[in-house]
Amino acid sequence: MILLVDADSLIFASCYKKRENPEDDKYYRNIEDAQAKFDEQFMSIVNKLEDMYPVERVITFSGSKGNFRKLITSDYKANRKKQELPPLLNEMHQYVKDQYDSVWGYGIETDDMVARYWYELSNELGRDNVMIVSID
């Protein structure tokens, strides 16, 4: 089994810490804390899947930039509210690119990149041998 992991949402979530009190900071400010949270969650997912399937390879995807759909229509994702981004988000994307050798591209969203790899690999190896892992 080949796992194709869309890590963007996991990266985003790893920037947030559990707050004990409402006034506590919601973000990690120390990159090592965010990295540890990502690593723990990522490996938990992979380990659970390895318990169920014979995983041969894990390909991680994250941090793609731009989107061809925005060139086609300016309304693409226009209904989304502007949201404050976690301060360590860019550093975390770079960490995952470096540490997990993640696949990314320009002009395409990460989930589209995952779908393209799934299509190519499932045609080559069979649909039962390739799994997309994503929370979005």
What spans do the regions from the language model cover?
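Noncatalytic, basic helical substrate-engagement surface that gates or grips nucleic-acid strands
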Residues: I2-D128
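Conserved RecA-like ASCE P-loop NTPase motor core of nucleic-acid helicases/translocases
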Residues: V130-D136
